[in-house]
Amino acid sequence: MRKSIRQRAKPWCVPLGLTLLIYILLRSVFLIGYVPSASMEPTLHEGSFILGLRLYSEPKVGDIIILEKDGVLLVKRIAACPGDPVDLSQLEYVTAIPIPVWEETVLTVPEGCYFVLGDNAQNSWDSRYWAQPFVSRQQIVAKLINSFCHCLDK
């Protein structure tokens, strides 16, 4: 006796449905990536895999975020939120890298923007060095919720 199309398709419904659900979650809710540099060491090691949450409340100081800058995903820590003052004279700089000259040494973070730093001040290309030192809320892709093994050795 021949099986109908419905009977033949039935065993595939659950696996296909689960695959679709996982795909939707990974594309719209979660972000899986890796730490591309040593800028967040010792907190996050270069090559570690990370899990970010795309849907979250407003970032706050201390949050580790994944942001997009010039088409590249970066992992940084929020150092100042909208309205917070940033005293540039108190920040640690790497002397080999030219620092943009701002007219003021104390900047106020504009509304809808953030000032970000890497935990490894000696090896981080972050708000201290960017011509436009602030990251807009739209540039923030996800908030870090977990990191996984440092599987890629240098």
Pin down the residues of each PLM region.
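Extended hydrophobic leader/signal-anchor segments used for secretion and membrane insertion
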Residues: M1-K154
